[in-house]
Amino acid sequence: MNLSNLKPAEGSTKTRKRIGRGPGSGLGGTSTRGHKGAKSRSGYKNKIGFEGGQMPIQRRLPKFGFKNINRVEYKAINIDTLQQMAEAKQLTKIGINELMEAGFISSSQVVKILGNGSLTAKLEVEAHAFSKSAEAAIQAAGGTVVKL
């Protein structure tokens, strides 16, 4: 046995349909396209979205909404996360750099602190935005809020 004698396994390959190669092939004549009509002609291509003449779905449904190019998408971080960070690393100041080092945000993200959970540590917190409840909780614990 050598490379020139190799053949594919029995039944693993099928012979290709050779359409339009005369009547002896069994696929000559109309070449599986039927008789006449637009679909039998050369260059026929089904139009994308065409539904046989009925009003297509993309024209039946209304247009709605838009994408606001000025939207700022904040990365939300709760005060209970700040509490855990302060306890684990004995921090008094939590800013963007500390959140990046801890892996909560990437350098391009904008941060908003939310008021879910409880905060007992006295912290100086730096962020781009704060919810009212988060701001109140940080100040109630004796901390300060710095908006960037």
From Swiss-Prot:
GO terms for cellular component: cytosolic large ribosomal subunit. Residues 1-51 are annotated as: Disordered. Disulfide bonds: none annotated. One of its GO terms (molecular function) is structural constituent of ribosome. Gene3D superfamilies: 3.100.10.10. It comes from the Bacteria. Residues 21-31 have a biased composition (Gly residues). It holds the Pfam family Ribosomal_L27A. Keywords: Ribonucleoprotein, Ribosomal protein, RNA-binding, rRNA-binding. The keyword Cell inner membrane does not apply. Belongs to the universal ribosomal protein uL15 family. PANTHER family: 50S RIBOSOMAL PROTEIN L15, LARGE RIBOSOMAL SUBUNIT PROTEIN UL15M. NCBIfam families: rplO_bact (TIGR01071). This is Large ribosomal subunit protein uL15. It comes from Parabacteroides distasonis (strain ATCC 8503 / DSM 20701 / CIP 104284 / JCM 5825 / NCTC 11152).
